[in-house]
């Protein structure tokens, strides 16, 4: 699976997480819900492990990626991707939104002008073929554009700021590559909702909420803008209005956990959190123990690289297991 660079990505922790889950479950645990899917790494891994999956996220870019995972790769999609990758930006009569907003043409440096034009022309052509492809194929193509565009972004990881000079990866020509090349079908139900209001039933509910006050809507807004442009805001980045998660607010996070635990029906909740999160380990154990037996596993993990020099290398990653009485 091609992926976007993501704060809090579980790419390096997914094997550990699923190993810990397997120690506590048996063959009757067939349904896996990923309530904060983000880059969809955990949804993808659960599908690889043959779970029936539910995937949810508040952010539109994540919803598009998870829907892209529903779609099997095919010769038809391969041909479309090759055709779109070969498009010549010289055929663009009028510069597109990304070019005029997020490249030097718009006095911003999220993408080179050439790559911004490629994003625009591919996005425009995906929209033109919307009536000729299925909904899943359409989302597959959009998701492929997001991961391809993200591979040439001129930022550290997030889109909260762009770099003053183009880095080497940003100067490369964007290759329009498929989100994945899995040709088999999967069982995946998708949602674009607040996790506190998600009334679903599952065996395993995996919860990977924001750990702190960083709003993902602000940090990845450019991906949403590629999908559906909104009026840009003032300031250097042109940040538009965006969705805000209550899990990023110190005053609301505990109540948000309570609402989620009450509204989601699961046999086992598996919750990722860390020593730098808004709630302490003790606070989490006290809160979660109100709903069932709570167990916590701790592992040292490398800090997000942009923060290493300021506060050291390691952070404690917590994995809380809450066994719900049936």
UniProtKB/Swiss-Prot annotation:
The keyword Lyase does not apply. Keywords: DNA-binding, Methyltransferase, Restriction system, S-adenosyl-L-methionine, Transferase. Pfam families: MethyltransfD12 (PF02086). It catalyses: a 2'-deoxyadenosine in DNA + S-adenosyl-L-methionine = an N(6)-methyl-2'-deoxyadenosine in DNA + S-adenosyl-L-homocysteine + H(+). Induction: Expressed in the early phase of the viral replicative cycle. GO terms for molecular function: DNA binding; site-specific DNA-methyltransferase (adenine-specific) activity. Belongs to the N(4)/N(6)-methyltransferase family. This is Type II methyltransferase M.CviAII.
């Amino acid at each position: 699976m091609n992926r976007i660079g993501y704060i809090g990505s579980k790419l390096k922790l997914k094997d550990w997480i699923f190993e810990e889950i397997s120690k506590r479950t048996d063959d009757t645990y067939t349904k896996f819900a990923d309530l904060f899917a983000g880059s969809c790494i955990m949804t993808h891994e659960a599908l690889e492990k043959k779970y029936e999956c539910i995937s949810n996220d508040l952010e539109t870019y994540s919803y598009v990626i998870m829907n892209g995972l529903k779609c099997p790769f095919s010769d038809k999609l391969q041909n479309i991707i090759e055709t779109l990758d070969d498009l010549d930006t010289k055929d663009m009569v009028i510069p597109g939104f990304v070019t005029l907003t997020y490249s030097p043409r718009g006095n911003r440096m999220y993408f080179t002008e050439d790559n911004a034009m490629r994003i625009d022309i591919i996005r425009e052509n995906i929209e033109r073929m919307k009536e000729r492809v299925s909904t899943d194929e359409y989302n597959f193509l959009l998701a492929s554009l997001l991961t391809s565009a993200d591979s040439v972004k001129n930022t550290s990881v997030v889109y909260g700021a762009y770099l003053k000079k183009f880095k080497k990866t940003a100067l490369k020509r964007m290759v329009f590559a498929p989100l994945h090349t899995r040709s088999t079908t999967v069982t995946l139900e998708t949602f674009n909702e607040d996790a506190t209001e998600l009334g679903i039933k599952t065996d395993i509910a995996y919860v990977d909420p924001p750990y702190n006050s960083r709003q993902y809507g602000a940090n990845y807004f450019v991906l949403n803008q590629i999908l559906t442009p909104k009026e840009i805001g003032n300031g250097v980045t042109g940040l538009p209005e965006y969705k805000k998660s209550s899990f990023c607010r110190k005053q609301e996070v505990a109540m948000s956990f309570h609402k989620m635990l009450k509204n989601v029906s699961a046999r086992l909740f598996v919750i990722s959190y860390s020593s730098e999160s808004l709630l302490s380990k003790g606070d989490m154990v006290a809160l979660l123990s109100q709903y069932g037996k709570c167990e916590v596993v701790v592992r040292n993990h490398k800090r997000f690289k942009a923060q290493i020099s300021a506060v050291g290398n390691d952070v404690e990653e917590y994995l809380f297991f809450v066994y719900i009485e049936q």
